[in-house]
Amino acid sequence: MEGAEGNAGQPGPAERSHRSSVSSVGARAADVLVYLADDTVVPLAVENLSSISAHELHRAVREVLQLPDMALEAFALWLVSPLLEVQLKPKHQPYKLGRQWPELLLRFTDASDDDIAMDEPSLQFRRNVFFPKRRELQVHDEEVLRLLYEEAKGNVLTARYPCDLEDCEVLGGLVCRVQLGPYQPGQPAACTVREKLDSFLPAHLCKRGHGLFAAFRGRGAKTGPCEQGLLNAYRQVKEMAGGDSERETTLGSHYRAYLLKCHELPFYGCAFFHGEVDKPTQGFLHRGGRKPVTVAISLEGVHVIDNREKHVLLGLRFQELSWDHTSPEEEEPVLWLEFDGDSEGTPVNKLLRIYSKQAELMSVLIEYCIELSQAAEPALPQESASGPQEAPSPSSAPTQRPKLRRQGSVVCSRIQHLSTIDYVEDGSGIKRVKPKRTTSFFSRQLSSSHGSYTVVQPNDNSPEQG
């Protein structure tokens, strides 16, 4: 947060730009800049910057934006840079954490000394990871809906939320409606959509060719399949009855529709972490290596996402896994995930290694999310009795999930693309031998709920190690 002037204009390794959250510092006062999801800035004149808490800054942002009390639960302050993202607790002091940023990068990232020296966090007002989707269904304030919509839209467009093309088109159609107004058959919507395609669809879905051929493509060129699908979705956006005086209400309904569609994505509202996993060995030389992944953790479970292919490699609810993290000296920290699987038809327990200096952060978050989920379970029946809008999100899952579990959906697990350690309980490993044990490989699991995770028992017909 400090030293913005010294770093201004210096490009990082990926030509990234840094945004300072302290615009001017005096002896006792400073102008703190808090960034919203749409990149707009909320300037705050703050006394005693070095000791002000995240809770106090959060309250100041809510007052400036005139947000209702629910915003205290829905949003949190984050320190964010291209290298690390940290959601602040109410008691945290953002300025002091900003001063400690290089130490945090050394501890939780593999960044080089040069990258660490140039990296600077910005203070952002973003969705609270611990805000349940069932509570989000109760939001009616249009500004709160807009902020949630802008953040979700950004995550979709940057492919942080991997989506199938069909879902991207539906979401993009809603963005067209918000930005361009109601669909009008007589207007040149196709040209507008083509010129701003990356404002409506993720970049990897709207890449076009370059060079001589692309130069001859004029405005009258035939609409591409992605553009046509987007236009069809735009045309099908349902409008609320009413005139111009109800424009705000209408926009609020489209924000809500966008968020409800995002609720179908299993990683909506997650915190994201960087890591690597082993590739399966392939070819005559048994080459393996690693692939970079993003680990998404929410109140509902854990998802491992392939950064390059932009699809899910593994998705697990907390009831389906146990976990631990290890950080031995002179070795990489590892987050271990254990789950049920099969090897050539034989039930086994699978172990996935995720190499990451953020393994400790991920393990702590998993444990806390499980604690929150268990604490919330007794309250769910009372909340659902008060009305359909307050029903918990799992009740709608059976009707929503099949839409995303289409053949080859990007949100379906691809365990075959992972290299795992397979074993049975007594240690007679199918692919790798593990020591004898009488319980799960890890003791840390969601044991108090009725989960589907089980420890595989050995049997006389188990194949030998191959």
Swiss-Prot record:
This is FERM domain-containing protein 8. It is found in: Cytoplasm, Cytosol; Cell membrane. SMART domains: B41. It comes from Rattus norvegicus. Residues 30-377 form the FERM domain. Residues 383-399 have a biased composition (Polar residues). The keyword Transmembrane helix does not apply. Interacts with iRhom1/RHBDF1 and iRhom2/RHBDF2 (via cytoplasmic N-termini); this interaction leads to mutual protein stabilization. Interacts with ADAM17; this interaction is indirect and mediated by iRhom proteins. Interacts with LRP6; this interaction affects LRP6-binding to AXIN1. Keywords: Acetylation, Cell membrane, Cytoplasm, Membrane, Phosphoprotein. GO terms for biological process: negative regulation of canonical Wnt signaling pathway; positive regulation of tumor necrosis factor production; protein localization to plasma membrane. CDD domains: FERM_B-lobe. Promotes the cell surface stability of iRhom1/RHBDF1 and iRhom2/RHBDF2 and prevents their degradation via the endolysosomal pathway. By acting on iRhoms, involved in ADAM17-mediated shedding of TNF, amphiregulin/AREG, HBEGF and TGFA from the cell surface. Negatively regulates Wnt signaling, possibly by antagonizing the recruitment of AXIN1 to LRP6. Its main location: cytoplasm. GO terms for cellular component: centriolar satellite; cytosol; nucleoplasm; plasma membrane. SUPFAM superfamilies: Second domain of FERM. It comes from the Eukaryota.
